[in-house]
A protein has these predicted regions:
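Active-site neighborhoods and metal-handling regions in enzymes and metal-associated proteins
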Residues: 1-173
């Protein structure tokens, strides 16, 4: 759970801080069935009105996820998929220095990653058909953050999300 002062970083430490009105909260969730793993991240806002910066950033991230999905298919290079994301960020003057995803699927403790594909600039790894990847478009800004992630099954000409959860950022009051 990314909230409060921990909302601007990935994988924060646990705290006893209480959630407060006006906070944007991201949840990173994982599921596992017979050692097949999936990840999912979504964001909510506590209160009656989303901040303009959250609305604007969410639109960019959604456009970026759409661009990533359009370029992720069998035999695509991981760096080209990352470039589709970066092109969207460049249009809006935003920056994300960390990778945007990795292979996932069959995993064994202590970690669910397969350590074979990493979506980062200039990565030359070819994404094979039937790979399963976790694309994480987290934007950790100064004092706040938001996340959208999907676990995607790579097919011959496209990819398919393994979840059907909305990308919308709901208000919780």
């Amino acid at each position: 759970i990314l909230a409060g002062k921990s909302a601007s970083t990935a994988h924060p430490m646990w705290t006893d801080d209480k959630l407060k009105d006006g906070q944007t909260v991201s949840f990173e969730l994982g599921g596992c069935r017979k050692r097949y793993n999936v990840g999912l991240a979504r964001t909510v806002h506590l209160g009656n009105k989303k901040p303009a910066k959250l609305i604007e950033t969410a639109k960019v991230v959604e456009e970026g996820m759409t661009a990533v999905k359009a370029t992720l298919f069998a035999n695509a290079k991981a760096g080209d998929v990352h470039k589709a994301w970066q092109n969207v960020l460049d249009k809006f003057g935003l920056e994300k220095k960390s990778r945007i995803g990795y292979s996932i699927g069959v995993g064994y403790p202590p970690d669910w990653g397969e350590h074979t594909i990493s979506f980062r600039p200039k990565e030359q790894t070819v994404v094979p058909e039937n790979a399963v990847v976790h694309i994480i478009l987290g934007m950790w800004m100064d004092g706040w953050g938001m996340e959208l992630s999907e676990t995607l099954h790579v097919r011959k000409h496209d990819c398919m999300a393994l979840s059907k959860f909305s990308w919308d950022i709901p208000l919780l009051s």
